[in-house]
Amino acid sequence: MAERSKWFMFWVVCGSFLAGILAVCGLVSGVNWAGSDKFCGTFCHTMNGVAYAWKQGAHGRNPSGVTAGCSDCHLYNASEPVLGPLGYISLLGHKVVAASHSGFGQVIGRFDTPMTWLQQRPEVEQQEIGWFKGNNFHTCRGCHDLSLMYDKMNPSIGAWHALYKDQTLDCLSCHKDVGHDYKQVDEYIKTNNAYPPLDE
């Protein structure tokens, strides 16, 4: 009987270990999927206009081919090269808060049509700008090292950015449309009462 108990415990431990690994893999895969640009642009209906505007901005269509996606800018720790357990938990918390704003807005009708979305966008945009300012543009700095900024066509750009290296700054005061350029989206919605089609 004792021998059977040992084997039973062995399989319980192995099964629990395997279930834990599968649960963690499932969580990480789900979080990565829910943070993808495809999820934000096509699955989450409140983001259709935002996704189109992102594709018009420098982060969505950079001539170099390097793009910054939704999570890179809008999740506090997403631009970190390596995330420890606490950083990942913080990222999950921020993701839940961000998703709840969009989801709740969709449920109560705040973003249920392109026109209501267009009316609410300035307020939401100011909230996002406030978030960026509140964390001193941490996600911008996660990708852009201000001390390394250089443009051979305009060498003074490096000098100007270097001034802000250790200071509080407002990236959006100079780079307003870098993440999203809403001109075409706004015009399309006003004319057609619909979001512009997203090219896949």
Where are these regions (language model features)?
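Short sequence/structural segments immediately N-terminal
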Residues: 2-200
